[in-house]
């Protein structure tokens, strides 16, 4: 299949290298598949539809975000069991409404993009961006593929939603677009969003959480064969919880945030991180859209607990990427200053315990030597009867290691937001359910599996 796009030309136009009279040719001009014309058409269920071949337009976070299907700034939609494919840009949009400041950075670039984005956040807070009127959608069991920009996109409008058991693949694999909005799932302001048990593979990127993913939880997802990172968390202050995931691409995680809890994951690729002291980014009151403050991303304030790292021959595998960060038990090394730039080179301390590094993955020097073992591990992803499986062979040392159960009390609070790592309803949690839904006890294994296993289904059941 070949894609070719063209605005309505004044004269006939032919795709290069193709005779449209000698092959199947389809022209898509429909901008939406299932998308209300008006805002606030809330509490609609869409189940079992095939939505395909939609000529969707670009969906940036600073303008109206169209999609093949979406609620258009509403509350409480259920999109379940649908097939969404061959959308020029985005499959499912949970994104931003039309706004008087749409694309203002392109129209008048005298203010930077981060500043105009911040203004858009405040203008929508003044109008109706709150938990009672927008968001809270349930997106489950959908098959989304062959989209040019994103499988699921959403700025502000995805807050308080659940995205579960979806299979998303082949997103932007043709490279028809470049820029900062391409991913299987790309969300801004993913406040209290639960992203659970999805399979995201063979895309330009797996999951990208950008700005204000406060209270989000990423749990029991599988990623493989993604071109850049499986997971990118950008300029978020935390708390963000990432637990029991399988990161199997060459690059597992890009961390340009702070206050992230990485617990009981399998990382089979590189990890990279850096602060961002070039722009002020916002944090919120717990479980709310209301802004509590704004500050730089200094880096650190992470909790890296009970993960399994399998090296892939690259240098940045394992917890050693945190070398130079202070241990949280040493406290925050700061003196009082009213100048945010005074701390630009002073990262927050981190809490790193209970991890196991294999296959050349290297430990952070603050961890005991036993957390790094020379033993080899092997894994592969195969397809069987239309479903994907992980084959995993771990050495005996992986089953000899022990780790403690992680709870809300263990994780504490993120520094800037002063918000706890907890359920979206504000109740405490225990990260005691592994990738296969087995329960953990007080002493458990590092990594995503509470019991030894060698054959793991990645495709959600029923998909």
Task: Report each predicted region and the residues it spans.
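Surface beta-loop-beta hairpin patches that serve as ligand-binding interfaces in beta-rich domains
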Residues: 3-17, 332-463
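Extracellular beta-strand-rich solenoid/capping regions of secreted or surface-exposed proteins
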Residues: 7, 27-45, 61-74
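Linear-motif-rich, low-complexity cytosolic tails and juxtamembrane regions
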Residues: 33-40, 45, 52-53, 58-60, ...
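A mature extracytoplasmic/lumenal domain signature
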Residues: 15-17, 50, 96
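N-terminal presequences and immediately downstream first alpha-helices
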Residues: 1-2, 163
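Small/polar beta-strand repeat architecture
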Residues: 16-31
